[in-house]
């Protein structure tokens, strides 16, 4: 009996050491796996500043993806930047090529007319002092270049081409603007074709020397924390603003994920202070938009 007891006492420490070794081995393996995931970019370490910032802090601008490294024509690399969650808005840098920008402008120039706004009572168009630019519409699939651009927009937004209106090309000269407004409709007429406007893609076809920003006065967040704050005009500092940079495209959603209208999507075009501004807009509807 004593012999068995001694054997039991000798065996117990060996069992304890074995468990410790197993636990240590598991920890080492986990550490190796984590290091591999970090090396592959699947995992990332949290940013120290992220703990002290709010969800809507605009300093937390994230570079989301990189799709090309540019070309010899000076078009630059393409990458996407989240600029706001309320409203949901992202900028696709170098979305268009220089040639595509010039092509859209050349198509629009011969038929430019004074821009109008939607009459909520009739669903038609009317002149208004809140919008002083000139513009024209290009039918959907106008030519091969337009088709390529529209397909790229659809791929970017994950919304079918058929849900989009034709491209609108706009021109703003010094002093011209578009005061804050919503792209979604508040009348029953304009929602009959395709339903509500769900998203807007605004493409900048030219650089602007000063002014001409797209401003979101109702955006939530620390708007003065954006890196380009000092480059903004007085109007641009009245909300979250995007500088008009040639080839860039701004996507923002007029509706929330639950399909309710998003009042934080209120936006406007600041007056051009110096130079002139060319842009092109694509509106998307919930359903197919018949042309």
UniProtKB/Swiss-Prot annotation:
Reactions listed under catalytic activity: L-prolyl-[collagen] + 2-oxoglutarate + O2 = trans-4-hydroxy-L-prolyl-[collagen] + succinate + CO2
Chain positions recorded as 2-oxoglutarate binding sites: 277
Transmembrane segments: 23-43
Keyword annotations from UniProtKB, A to Z: Dioxygenase, Endoplasmic reticulum, Glycoprotein, Golgi apparatus, Iron, Membrane, Metal-binding, Oxidoreductase, Signal-anchor, Transmembrane, Transmembrane helix
Record topological domains on the Cytoplasmic side: 1-22
Enzyme class: oxidoreductase
Named cofactor requirement(s): Fe(2+); L-ascorbate
GO biological process: root hair cell development
Name of the protein described by the UniProt record: Prolyl 4-hydroxylase 5
Species, as recorded: Arabidopsis thaliana (Mouse-ear cress)
């Amino acid at each position: 009996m004593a012999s068995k007891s001694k054997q039991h006492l000798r065996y117990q420490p060996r069992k304890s050491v074995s468990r410790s070794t197993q636990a240590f081995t598991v920890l080492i393996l986990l550490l190796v796996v984590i290091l591999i995931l970090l090396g592959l970019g699947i995992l990332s370490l949290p940013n120290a500043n992220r703990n002290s910032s709010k969800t809507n802090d605009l300093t937390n601008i994230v570079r989301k993806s990189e799709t090309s490294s540019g070309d010899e024509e000076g078009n630059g690399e393409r990458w996407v930047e989240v600029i706001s969650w309320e409203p949901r808005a992202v900028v696709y840098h170098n979305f268009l090529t220089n040639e595509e920008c010039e092509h859209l402008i050349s198509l629009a120039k011969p038929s430019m007319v004074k821009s109008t706004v939607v009459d909520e009572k009739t669903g038609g168009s009317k002149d208004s002092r809140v919008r002083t630019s000139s513009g024209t519409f290009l039918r959907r699939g106008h030519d091969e270049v337009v088709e390529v651009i529209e397909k790229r927009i659809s791929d970017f937004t994950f919304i079918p081409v058929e849900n989009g209106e034709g491209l609108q090309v706009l021109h703003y000269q010094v002093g011209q603007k578009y005061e804050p407004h919503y792209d979604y409709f508040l009348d029953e007429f304009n929602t009959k074709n395709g339903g509500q406007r769900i998203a807007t893609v605004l493409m900048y076809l030219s650089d602007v020397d000063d002014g001409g920003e797209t401003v979101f006065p109702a955006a939530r967040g620390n708007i003065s924390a954006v890196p380009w704050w000092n480059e903004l005009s007085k109007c641009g500092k009245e909300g979250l603003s995007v500088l008009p940079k040639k080839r860039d495209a701004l996507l923002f959603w007029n509706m929330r994920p639950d399909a309710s209208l998003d009042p934080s999507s209120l936006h406007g075009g600041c007056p051009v202070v110096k130079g002139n501004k060319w842009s092109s807009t694509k509106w998307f509807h919930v359903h197919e938009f018949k042309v």
